[in-house]
């Protein structure tokens, strides 16, 4: 570098130092001028359009928001719309619990994340987004899976909790811990084109999740968005409504006198609708919030409340090892020129899954249709005219779960003997064998 360029660079650095000093001085003056106000001057500008809405309570309401701590469990389809609106509104501290990482398949609905953050922890991605949106708030992340051992430590100190999870097990856990800590919960769920929302344990007088659902749904009735799909704007609206309900709680819109338990149901298709149903209140016999409750902090932390056992789990491991083949073994027989002459290739995914991406040689009979045949071979032969009791049948599904159930069904109900499923399913084949196939 010659002397001219060195001198020029030195001058630029000096100018930057001077500008930095001036900015610091201006900031100090602004902070000094706002000492007599509950908010900084920048915060008055930031929240002004919100404070002039009469229902928010003006400056006093904004101070309530600033002094409130809200914990959001899940930074997915529900948490993504709720988080930025809570941050934008000025909630003073926001906690985010999520140990998942951002995946490409999330981005159509979890719009707080973006393509550059694939592989990043969702809680960290969310933290980066909302702190850029509002630098006046404090954000705490918990990159862990919520369980009986850590829930009390995480929840402690928060005023409100948003349950943005997608499993009954976690909903029971969140509700139980919140009741024991005296925290109000905004709880929601969504799937496909629909969603629902409610408020649990309002001010320790409202019903908890167990008051509504004393027993969990059977495992085979529970569908995740990974299995059933979800429309982004539909789940987004429900998440946004969660933020609205949280603001109403913080601002005191709901009181012990006017609060009535409710369940809001949103449907996006074919025409959008929003219905609100009155729900029953706190139940005296409830095991968690009733008079003789047994679900206590001690019982939960000691593991006496077995949530996995209580909620159950669908058992997919129903096949013997010799009834399953690896994707490598499947690849070898699939590439055989006489594959179709020797085998019947059955894809048991739902038809709309099959239409997205499939092997051209596979015949699609959804597992639901197989069940409806109730072991009637003639009904199966209407779909597969060439199938016989001694046919070699290879079954494929999305992940290798339904294919096991279908294998068991064909053997036990229909009487077939030569049936095998592909371990790991269609997606395992794509990951390990052929990445050129569309993966949805």
Swiss-Prot record:
<keyword id="KW-0963">Cytoplasm</keyword>
<dbReference type="GO" id="GO:0005737">
    <property type="term" value="C:cytoplasm"/>
</dbReference>
<feature type="domain" description="Rhodanese">
    <location>
        <begin position="339"/>
        <end position="438"/>
    </location>
</feature>
<dbReference type="GO" id="GO:0034227">
    <property type="term" value="P:tRNA thio-modification"/>
</dbReference>
<keyword id="KW-0819">tRNA processing</keyword>
<dbReference type="InterPro" id="IPR035985">
    <property type="entry name" value="Ubiquitin-activating_enz"/>
</dbReference>
<comment type="function">
    <text>Plays a central role in 2-thiolation of mcm(5)S(2)U at tRNA wobble positions of cytosolic tRNA(Lys), tRNA(Glu) and tRNA(Gln). Acts by mediating the C-terminal thiocarboxylation of sulfur carrier URM1. Its N-terminus first activates URM1 as acyl-adenylates (-COAMP), then the persulfide sulfur on the catalytic cysteine is transferred to URM1 to form thiocarboxylation (-COSH) of its C-terminus. The reaction probably involves hydrogen sulfide that is generated from the persulfide intermediate and that acts as a nucleophile towards URM1. Subsequently, a transient disulfide bond is formed.</text>
</comment>
<comment type="similarity">
    <text>In the N-terminal section; belongs to the HesA/MoeB/ThiF family. UBA4 subfamily.</text>
</comment>
<feature type="binding site">
    <location>
        <position position="77"/>
    </location>
    <ligand>
        <name>ATP</name>
    </ligand>
</feature>
<feature type="modified residue" description="Phosphoserine">
    <location>
        <position position="326"/>
    </location>
</feature>
<dbReference type="GO" id="GO:0032447">
    <property type="term" value="P:protein urmylation"/>
</dbReference>
<feature type="binding site">
    <location>
        <position position="208"/>
    </location>
    <ligand>
        <name>Zn(2+)</name>
    </ligand>
</feature>
<dbReference type="GO" id="GO:0042292">
    <property type="term" value="F:URM1 activating enzyme activity"/>
</dbReference>
<dbReference type="GO" id="GO:0002143">
    <property type="term" value="P:tRNA wobble position uridine thiolation"/>
</dbReference>
<feature type="active site" description="Glycyl thioester intermediate; for adenylyltransferase activity">
    <location>
        <position position="225"/>
    </location>
</feature>
<keyword id="KW-0479">Metal-binding</keyword>
<dbReference type="Pfam" id="PF00581">
    <property type="entry name" value="Rhodanese"/>
</dbReference>
<feature type="binding site">
    <location>
        <position position="289"/>
    </location>
    <ligand>
        <name>Zn(2+)</name>
    </ligand>
</feature>
<dbReference type="GO" id="GO:0005829">
    <property type="term" value="C:cytosol"/>
</dbReference>
<feature type="binding site">
    <location>
        <position position="122"/>
    </location>
    <ligand>
        <name>ATP</name>
    </ligand>
</feature>
<feature type="modified residue" description="N-acetylmethionine">
    <location>
        <position position="1"/>
    </location>
</feature>
<keyword id="KW-0511">Multifunctional enzyme</keyword>
<protein>
    <recommendedName>
        <fullName>Adenylyltransferase and sulfurtransferase UBA4</fullName>
        <ecNumber>2.7.7.-</ecNumber>
        <ecNumber>2.8.1.-</ecNumber>
    </recommendedName>
</protein>
<dbReference type="GO" id="GO:2000220">
    <property type="term" value="P:regulation of pseudohyphal growth"/>
</dbReference>
<dbReference type="InterPro" id="IPR001763">
    <property type="entry name" value="Rhodanese-like_dom"/>
</dbReference>
<dbReference type="GO" id="GO:0034599">
    <property type="term" value="P:cellular response to oxidative stress"/>
</dbReference>
<dbReference type="InterPro" id="IPR028885">
    <property type="entry name" value="MOCS3/Uba4"/>
</dbReference>
<feature type="binding site">
    <location>
        <begin position="166"/>
        <end position="167"/>
    </location>
    <ligand>
        <name>ATP</name>
    </ligand>
</feature>
<keyword id="KW-0548">Nucleotidyltransferase</keyword>
<keyword id="KW-0067">ATP-binding</keyword>
<dbReference type="InterPro" id="IPR000594">
    <property type="entry name" value="ThiF_NAD_FAD-bd"/>
</dbReference>
<keyword id="KW-0862">Zinc</keyword>
<keyword id="KW-0808">Transferase</keyword>
<feature type="binding site">
    <location>
        <begin position="105"/>
        <end position="109"/>
    </location>
    <ligand>
        <name>ATP</name>
    </ligand>
</feature>
<dbReference type="GO" id="GO:0007114">
    <property type="term" value="P:cell budding"/>
</dbReference>
<keyword id="KW-0833">Ubl conjugation pathway</keyword>
<dbReference type="GO" id="GO:0016783">
    <property type="term" value="F:sulfurtransferase activity"/>
</dbReference>
<keyword id="KW-0597">Phosphoprotein</keyword>
<dbReference type="GO" id="GO:0005524">
    <property type="term" value="F:ATP binding"/>
</dbReference>
<feature type="binding site">
    <location>
        <position position="98"/>
    </location>
    <ligand>
        <name>ATP</name>
    </ligand>
</feature>
<dbReference type="InterPro" id="IPR045886">
    <property type="entry name" value="ThiF/MoeB/HesA"/>
</dbReference>
<dbReference type="GO" id="GO:0042802">
    <property type="term" value="F:identical protein binding"/>
</dbReference>
